[in-house]
Amino acid sequence: ISIVGTNGKYSTIQAMFAILKEANIKCNIYTSPHIKSINERFVFNNQELNDEELASLFEEIESANNNEPITFFEILTAAYFLKASQYQDNINLIETGLFHRFDATNILKTNLASIVTSIGLDHLDWLPDNEQNVEKIIYEKTSTLLNSNIIVAKQSSKEITDSIKKIIS
C-alpha cells in the first residue's frame, strides 16, 4: 500500500498499521523522515530493524551498486525492499518521498492500494519556476498511481479533489 500526499502520510500509516495488526495481518512499514533514529523508518513484524541488520543491508546494497551514483533516499529504499523480500506474505505500508512520479519507492508494478492524503503547496521550490502550482504537485504525487486501487482522503478544497480525480482517471 503506497501512501502519497503532502500531510498525514505517517499518521495514515500508523492508523492502517493498527487496523491490520488488530486483524492479525502482518505488516512492514517504510517511512521518512525519521524523528529519533534511522531505524524507525524500517518496521518488519512489529519490530524496528536494529543497527546490525541495517548496516548489513547497507553493505549489501553498496556491494551490488558497483559505485554507481545513488542518493541517500535510494539507499534507504533499496534497504527496505531488500529486507521486505524476506517477508513476502506481509503487507507493505510505504510512505513515498517528496513526489511519487520519480520516487525511489515507485518501483512496484501493482499495489494492493494507494492512499492519497491531503495535498498542499509544500515543496513548490522543487518544481521548475513555470510549474510551481498545485496542479503540478498533484500530477507529481498521483500520476503514477494508475496501477492500483486508489483511495483519496478528504482534501482542503473541491478544486484539489477534482484535479486528483482528473489525473488518476
Predicted regions span which residues?
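Walker A (P-loop) phosphate-binding motif
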Residues: 1-35, 40, 113-115
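Glycine- and other small-residue-rich loops at beta-strand/loop junctions that grip anionic moieties
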Residues: 5, 73, 153-155
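Short beta->alpha junction loops/turns
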Residues: 6, 47, 98, 156-157
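Hydrophobic (often cysteine-bearing) scaffold residues that line and stabilize catalytic clefts
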Residues: 12, 73, 160
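Aromatic/hydrophobic pocket-lining residues that form π-stacking "cages" and hydrophobic walls in ligand
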Residues: 16, 80, 164-165
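ATP-dependent carboxylate-amine ligase catalytic core
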Residues: 22-109, 121-132
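Acidic, Mg2+-coordinating active-site environments of NTP-dependent enzymes
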Residues: 67, 87-95, 111-169
